[in-house]
C-alpha cells in the first residue's frame, strides 16, 4: 500500500492511498484537478472518497471526481447534503482496498468532524496538525481537547495525515512558548529545510507530536511553568483552551483554518 500527499489549493493536502492493483481512495478532495493529474500519471482507478467534514476546501472536488469515476463517498452526516452517499459515524468500520478502517469522532473544528484510522494511517482532517491543532469553529475547546485524547490513545507509530501544511508556523508558536526546548528547535530547522525544498512535512508520527505539539502536552509541568498556568488536577483541558486562544492571536497565522 502506498500513500501520496497531493498538494492542493493554497496549503491543503489531499491524501491518496493505493494498492498494487491500481485501485485507490482519496481523502478530503477540495480540488479535483490535482487528483485527476495524479490518477492519470499513476494510472490509478479511484474507488472511494473519504470526507472528514463539510468545509469547501475538503469537499469541493467531489462533484467533478464523481463524474469521472463511479465512487462511493463516505462522510459524516454534515456532508450528506453536499456529496456523501454513505453516512458513517464513530464505531463504524469500512473495508477499503482490502484494509479495515475505523471511523473515529473528532468534534471541535466542526461538530460532526470524523477521522478514519487504518494502522498506521490516521486521516484526521483539521483536528490535529503537526505541532498544532485546528481552529474551533462549531464545537468547544473541551471537545477538541477530548478529540486529541482520542488520537493520543492510538499507537505511537501512527502516521498522522492532516489536511494542511501549517507545520512551520505551528513550530514557531511552540518555540515561542518553549524557547529552550531542543527537540522543538531541532525539528523546526529540519522542517525549514524540507519546505525550502518544496517537500511536505507530513505525515507526522504521533510519537513525535507528543514531543513537539503543545496541544499534546497539556499535562506537562514544563509547559505549565513556561506559560505560568497551573490547572487543577483533571482540568488539563483549560491549558488546551489557553493555548488555543494564544494560537488564535499568534502572528503569521491568518490563513490557518
From Swiss-Prot:
Keywords from the named record: Hydrolase, Metal-binding, Zinc
Pathway(s): Secondary metabolite metabolism; methylglyoxal degradation; (R)-lactate from methylglyoxal: step 2/2
Cofactor note: Binds 2 Zn(2+) ions per subunit.
Cysteine disulfide partners in this protein: none
Cofactor names: Zn(2+)
Residues the entry annotates as binding Zn(2+) 2: 57-58, 126, 164
Residues where Zn(2+) 1 binds: 53, 55, 109, 126
Organism: Baumannia cicadellinicola subsp. Homalodisca coagulata
Nucleus recorded as keyword: no
Entry similarity comment: Belongs to the metallo-beta-lactamase superfamily. Glyoxalase II family.
Protein name (Swiss-Prot/TrEMBL): Hydroxyacylglutathione hydrolase
Entries under CDD domains matching the protein: hydroxyacylglutathione_hydrolase_MBL-fold
Pfam name, any one: HAGH_C
Gene3D superfamilies, alphabetized: Ribonuclease Z/Hydroxyacylglutathione hydrolase-like
Catalysed conversion reaction: an S-(2-hydroxyacyl)glutathione + H2O = a 2-hydroxy carboxylate + glutathione + H(+)
Enzymatic class: hydrolase
GO biological process assignments: methylglyoxal catabolic process to D-lactate via S-lactoyl-glutathione
Subunit structure: Monomer.
The protein's Enzyme Commission number: 3.1.2.6
